[in-house]
Amino acid sequence: YWDLYDRASLPLADNTFPPEGSPDFAVHGDQELRSYDDCHDLPWPGEAPWDEARQRELVHGYHASVSYIDAQVGRLLDALDRLGVRENTIVVLWGDHGWKLGEHNGWCKQTNYEIDTRVPMIFSGYGVNAKDRKSRALTEFVDIYPTLCEMAGLPVPEELQGSSLVPLLSQPDKTWKKAAFSQFLLGRFGPPETREQERMGYAIRTDRYRYVEWYAWNKETKTKGEWLASELFDHEEDPDENRNLAHDSSYAQTREVLSQQLTMGWRYALPEQ
C-alpha cells in the first residue's frame, strides 16, 4: 500500500498556521506523534512548520493506511457476497475522528476544529433506499445506535441522545438537526506555556458556524470553572477555520445566539418529528 503513492505528488496543507485570534492552547500539541523516537523535534503549533520532506513522509503514510483499510473493507463486503447475505445485512462505516495532516500546523487529532471532528459515515445494504446518494444533514455518532435499532426492528431506548437516521436514508435532503455537538478535554500537555491547567472545550456546529467555549476544568470534581476563551468560525467565508471571529463586533449577535444554543444543548437541536 505504501507503493501505491508517489510521495512527491501528494498535496500538502496550505494553512500550516494556528487560527488567527484563537487561544494558543486550542490547537493540540500532537502528544501522540511527539512520543515517537523520530518525532521529538516536532514543532509546536505556534512554531515554524516541519520541513517539507517530513510532512510528505507523514502524508504518504496516511494515504497508505487509508488504502489498507479500504482493501480490508472490500474483503468484508466480498465475504458477505460470497455467503449470500449482503442484501439483508446492514453495513455502517464511519471514522471515529478526523485527522490533521499539517493543517493549523498540527498533526493527528484531538481538537474541536472541523478537521478533527468531521468524518465520513456510510450506511449500506438492507433498509437503505437512497442508494449512492449523499446527505449534507448534520449528524452525530450518537445517531448510529438508534438508527440500527429502528432498521433491525428493535425498540429504540428513550434515554438516548441520538436520533434515528432512517428518514435520511430515504430522503437525504430532508430538513434535520439544527446543530451537532462535540466536547474535548485538553489535558496538561502541549507547549510548556499552556500546561498550567486543564481545559474543557464545548463546541456547537450549525449549517454555517462552528462555535467553541473553553472553560477551566477540575478533573477531580468533573466540573467546569471560569470561562477562558471562545472561538467562532464562519464556514461560508472561512471553511478551513483560519480566523477566529469571536471578538469581531460584527458577529456579536451571532456569537450570543450560538452561546445560548450551546447551553441549551442537544435537545434544542433535535429534528422535528
Q: Locations of the language-model features?
A:
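Active-site-proximal cap/lid insertion segments
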Residues: 1-88, 92-138, 151-159, 220-227, ...
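Residues that flank catalytic or metal-binding motifs in active/ligand-binding sites
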Residues: 1, 97, 109, 115-119, ...
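Polar, surface-exposed loop/tail segments
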Residues: 86-92, 131-204, 251-261, 273
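C-terminal, low-complexity/hydrophilic appendages and adjacent surface loops
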Residues: 114-117, 185-247
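Short loop segments at secondary-structure junctions
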Residues: 125-128, 153-155, 171-173, 207-209, ...
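Short, flexible helix/strand-to-coil boundary loops that buttress conserved ligand/catalytic motifs
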Residues: 105, 169, 246
